[in-house]
């Protein structure tokens, strides 16, 4: 018998299993999944009644039992149809038991993003913070944690009001490898260490700590793994098969997921659309069991959710399975517990009837989901922790103004000839360009309604300056019809602010950029404005970098600022930086490459190391052999700083001694601090400013080739007045100085190492590792990349399922 959910929807919806091959969408090219309404549905959320409802006499309501035992008891009560109905992100619940439906799909990338917002009044908005790419540029761990804490509080308020669940598909902890990637804006940048720390802080803030007794919000680390291309050159994310060496999987693509699982104790992980080395991520037992659970220590009770439609994609377009039922079976057995989509709900019964999966196989994932809902207090009534959070808490946390602080701290000053901050003699400004008067664009993507959105134009008007506004040109326009109005406005002002760059019409989910140049004729208009002989400040907005070399080289462009996606208070933050009310201290967390970088080798080449044969010049700041326009870690101040240290030689450390010394407070010896990088930072200029620090390591220990350097720590010092000094102390962990061999093992190699402060290397501290090399993470052998599915009777991995 077809499951109840199928009976309910078959008459209303087209189904994949009823379509002929000729009607299939070619998802090798199309990057947007065609999700059924059931998957996309917003539900009226409610909590189970454990006081007097049918569930009240069942073990799921017994708080003396463990979350897993409670969940197991609940799922054991389901009929087979009821079980299947709760395998998708839109779970139908079980009405006869009083178990309400539940929507797993929530969003909290930089604020509450997918709740059931009402039209006006209470619960019509939530705080909209800067995008993660801008957050991370602040280099402030405390700020990231604050934001995550506020977001989790606001999520709980919506949940308690019946407007959302207690889990989210956030954060995105993929690394921003290639500059054309449309979703790089959602990430903390191109560095795996920074991404790992960001993930740790955001996850533990969302969840209410490291493995708390009661989960505040269930976080989901996504997209696991090797996912960083949307649609480049018609290579769809839904069908991409990314070829990645075990060395670089271990070294670059998975460390954020190790930290999320082992250290932050994240309770959910999302497997990605793409395949890696021939195996779709959601059907990859090596990824989901051998690595994630056995090696990365992801909780046995944590659940894996497929990206939305990714289980279906195991069949179409990957061709790894012969049909959608086999794709469901492959994914269930590999370890994908919940299907964001409808494949499990519509086809796991077929898989069961064909003896591809057992009831217990299907139960495992549903038990894991409900185990986490139990731990989040979902079944524990109004006296459960966090159930007292209300709309008043949304109002109070928004009033903390952290969205403004995050925008200010994430702004990066790329170029300045002392034009900034603007002189007090400047009384009027012309605000020109396609980003000048935007509002919603400030939010990037995955956002909900904000309480307000302050455009750059409004920000300058609120600063007290006399403002002249002209659009000038649109982002992608080649028309010069607005140039004259822009030039007229500029001539009337003492200084010119051009706000442009890119936005989510150019970089987005399912849409990579074709190039990394400034789109349209924005540079032409900037060039004409630069000929007027007035102070000219350019705001480069958007998540991904564009080649601003012409602006860097133009002496008449006096200052250049990267603002990213600064959120609801972005306009005030930008204006306050430019007028000098606040001082910039952000640093780029991506490399700004010259335009030709995006043209000389395929964006789907996942190899970081340079390769003359393929034309790959090396990817990320660690391996790039060319000259960037602006380096990763670049960022200027309004003041000057002097950095010094008492010693430039930290001595030597015996590897075996380090690893065998007791490590109280750490689960593994490699997590402990090897040494503290310490420097005195003095403000030698005339303006108060924060100071940001990146600490790099470099070495020729271990296998060649050698990365130029890599990040091992960072910090932000606040509010240094002129003449003041502060001590910078950055812990450097044992595992952060390890390298990766060709098999993927993380190894401590004996040899000489240097720690350097920022790109300028203003402080350099040497140390030496002695003794025998030692493996601190053994990378298991991947036996699945050449795996031929026994479920499918030995079919080839990549079938031609598209007509």
From Swiss-Prot:
GO cellular component labels: extracellular region
GO BP terms in the entry: arabinan catabolic process; xylan catabolic process
EC number: 3.2.1.37
Keyword Glycoprotein: yes
Glycosylation sites: 21, 44, 85, 122, 140, 234, 437, 474, 515, 611, 676, 698
Catalytic residues as annotated in Swiss-Prot or TrEMBL: 307
Gene3D superfamilies linked to this entry: Glycoside hydrolase family 3 C-terminal domain, Glycoside hydrolase, family 3, N-terminal domain, Immunoglobulins
Sorted UniProt keywords: Carbohydrate metabolism, Glycoprotein, Glycosidase, Hydrolase, Polysaccharide degradation, Secreted, Signal, Xylan degradation
Organism domain of life: Eukaryota
Subcellular location: Secreted
Protein name: Exo-1,4-beta-xylosidase xlnD
Natural source organism: Emericella nidulans (strain FGSC A4 / ATCC 38163 / CBS 112.46 / NRRL 194 / M139) (Aspergillus nidulans)
